[in-house]
Regions:
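Accessory cap/linker subdomain of secreted extracellular hydrolases
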Residues: 39-65, 133-134, 138-145, 150, ...
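Secretory targeting signatures
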Residues: 1-38, 603
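Cap/lid segment of the alpha/beta-hydrolase catalytic domain
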Residues: 109-189, 365-379, 502, 559, ...
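A catalytic-pocket lid/entrance helix-loop region that shapes and gates access to the active site
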Residues: 176, 201-270, 320, 327-334, ...
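Glycine/threonine-rich phosphate-binding loop and adjacent beta-strand/alpha-helix elements that clamp
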Residues: 38-63, 72-83, 388, 400-603
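N-terminal cap/lid segment of alpha/beta-hydrolase-fold proteins
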Residues: 56-109
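Short beta-strand/loop motif that positions the catalytic acidic residue
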Residues: 310, 316-318
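Residue in the alpha/beta-hydrolase core beta-strand immediately N-terminal to the catalytic nucleophile
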Residues: 197-199
Length: 603
């Protein structure tokens, strides 16, 4: 037989190839079945706007549902030695928690834990209490349960001492509470189904418990995600000596909502309960004579202890219009301290999501939509983060499982007009400072506080300053250094910053004159003494259009702050000063668009 023609050989090979092609997926199929799953989808933040999201729920969801299912709830109670923690109180106390495991633990897989540690389980007056730990908490609990258990995470809900079924003293953010929290983190990290890595999540008090845990530095605590979380009690209730109204009753209000008003409550009472009742009024009235700073409040400062003791990662979530847990919990501290910047400079992995929302979660659209003008209202259209569940998923994947790309240590900051951008740090470290000599502005009034001779109303001072020739992007913590004269050892100034053209509120600052040097330490002030009040504004990220100037409205009090304890007898005379603000010039390269849709629930 003669040689095969080249065209015939080619046709034969092509025919063979097409015959074998359908079988190609079968070769090595047993190996593919045992190979690891493809890594989850981690979209770039700039691409998220183009993706399909679950828009119709009350909270955000991950892009891809996980393969596992939650198992039935389990509960645990374990004993903690409290013999050395309280002057009086039980020598041992119990921590109670409930937890849900993903179905892959039935195959022996070890999983990380996401926990919410709270006083809010079975919280409230008898008959109207919130759910117990064995019921998935509304909002934050459902968010974790639905998003992360299917991806192989355990979820735990823990009650602090003296609440729900945890015994012992309700030691409001004190050392006893911290010990119970630390013990819970240790327990969760040591179970035979745990991979040893614990992350904490939650807002407000449930953010405070995260800092309490970090202060005691369990090796199992890998990351915290405080959402408007309290970092220390004194700066929560006081800003440069100005007292919030709740500072007078905070401890007792919590205690009254955690007891059942029966004989079992005796174990919940410890000396700090009584101390807490008096701490607020004494600090408010005595200022520099306050005896509580070195004990009661110092014990309840956690962020400084975590800074010394712990080496985990922090995803900081803060509402820039949150006047419940103010931004200075993140961007403040003792004189010379900015906790966000200091943690970053010390080498911690720190990321921030800083929206113009109030005391809410990034995806809590039902609350976002109710914000007023000057308090985030101008940013509502771009505020809700429907990608929050995915963003946090990528954080947990890396820090609790060690998979996926390392999240960038940046700050996602929203400007007051709604625009989001990426900053390496916030406040930006490349900002330039602009200063305005208030003597060049129009001043109305010369005293703050006291009673006006005309009309009997409170005296106020306003400064209205000329407009700028270009847009001014304020980004950081402006300062107001006021030249004042005191009438006695007391008095207070609340300063609201406004757009002079529109009256739009941009931010505020407050200070008790006894804290004129800034920080936490008061000094005695004498009648007639001239001094400079070194006021610092809460964090602001806002645009002031070209041609617009600033207006400062100085009153005795504002927002939720009390008037000074000295009442009408302590007016402060204002003799001018300097307003300074950090401003940045951005070209738009770091602006990103968040996922939004006309079909979304918030629209």
């Amino acid at each position: 037989m003669g040689a095969t023609h080249p065209m015939m050989r080619t046709a034969f090979l092509l025919s063979l190839l097409f015959l074998l092609l359908p079988l190609s997926g079968c070769f090595g199929s047993s190996e593919d079945e045992n190979s690891p799953q493809a890594p989850p989808y981690y979209p770039d933040i700039n691409d998220r706007q183009f993706l399909d999201w679950e828009w119709n729920g009350s909270y955000s969801m991950v892009l891809e549902q996980g393969p596992y299912t939650p198992l039935e709830v389990q509960e645990a109670t374990f004993e903690v030695d409290t013999s050395d923690i309280w002057e009086t109180g039980p020598p041992t106390s119990n921590v109670h928690l409930s937890y849900w495991l993903p179905s892959n633990t039935e195959d022996g897989e070890k999983v990380p834990v996401i926990a919410v540690i709270s006083p809010y389980f079975s919280y409230g007056q008898p008959g109207s209490e919130s759910g117990a730990t064995n019921v998935v908490g509304a909002g934050r609990g459902e968010f974790i349960y639905d998003n992360y258990i299917p991806h192989g995470y355990a979820f735990a809900q823990v009650s602090v001492f003296g609440t729900e079924e945890s015994s012992g003293c309700f030691d409001y953010r004190g050392a006893g509470e911290g010990l119970g929290i630390h013990s819970a983190v240790e327990w969760l990290g040591q179970q035979n189904w745990s991979n040893g890595n614990v992350g904490l999540y939650g807002k407000s008090y449930e953010g405070a418990t995260q800092w309490e845990a970090a202060a005691l530095a369990s090796e199992h605590l890998k990351t915290i995600v405080p959402i408007s979380g309290t970092t220390a009690l004194h700066p929560l209730l006081y800003k440069n000596g100005s007292a919030e109204a709740r500072s007078q009753v905070m401890h007792m209000n919590y205690f009254g909502s955690t007891v059942d008003y029966n004989g079992d409550d005796l174990d919940n009472i410890c000396p700090d309960i009584v101390e807490g009742i008096f701490a607020g009024p004494v600090t408010y009235g005595l200022g520099e004579l306050d005896p509580y700073m070195e004990n009661y409040y110092e014990e309840r400062s956690h962020i400084d202890k975590a800074f010394q003791n712990w080496n985990g990662s922090i995803y900081w979530i803060q509402g820039m219009q949150d006047w419940n847990v103010d931004p200075h919990q993140v961007f403040g501290g003792p004189s010379g301290t900015n906790w966000y910047l200091d943690y970053s400079a010390a080498g911690y992995d720190v990321r921030g999501m800083l929206g113009q929302w109030e005391h809410n979660y990034p995806d809590q659209w039902s609350k976002h939509n109710a914000q007023d003008s000057g308090y985030g209202g101008e940013a509502i259209h771009n505020m809700t983060r429907w990608d929050w569940g995915q963003d946090l998923f990528e954080w947990f994947e890396y820090y609790l499982k060690g998979v996926g790309p390392k999240p960038e240590n940046h700050a996602q900051i929203q400007r007051n007009d709604g625009e989001w951008r990426i900053e390496e740090l916030w406040p930006p470290q490349d900002a330039t400072w602009e200063s305005i000599d208030l003597s060049n502005c129009d001043q109305q009034g010369n005293s703050v506080g006291g009673t006006s001779v005309i009309g009997g109303g409170q005296q106020t001072v306003t400064f209205t300053c000329e407009g700028f020739t270009q847009d001014m992007h304020i980004a950081g913590l402006p300062t107001l250094h006021l030249d004042v004269s005191a009438s006695m050892d007391g008095g207070q100034i609340f300063a609201e910053l406004q757009d002079a053209e529109t009256g739009l509120r941009l931010g505020h600052a407050t200070m008790d004159i006894r804290y004129y040097a800034g920080g936490y330490d008061p000094q005695t002030v004498f009648p007639g003494q001239s001094l400079v009040m070194l006021m610092e504004f809460q964090g602001i990220d806002a645009i002031l259009p070209a041609g617009h100037g600033i207006k400062l409205v100085l009153t005795e009090t504002g927002e939720d702050y009390l008037a000074p304890a000295c009442g009408n007898s302590c007016p402060v005379t204002v003799d001018g000063g300097t307003f300074s603000f950090p401003q940045v010039d951005r070209n738009g390269d770091t602006v990103f668009v968040t996922p939004q849709s006309s079909e979304a629930a918030n629209n």
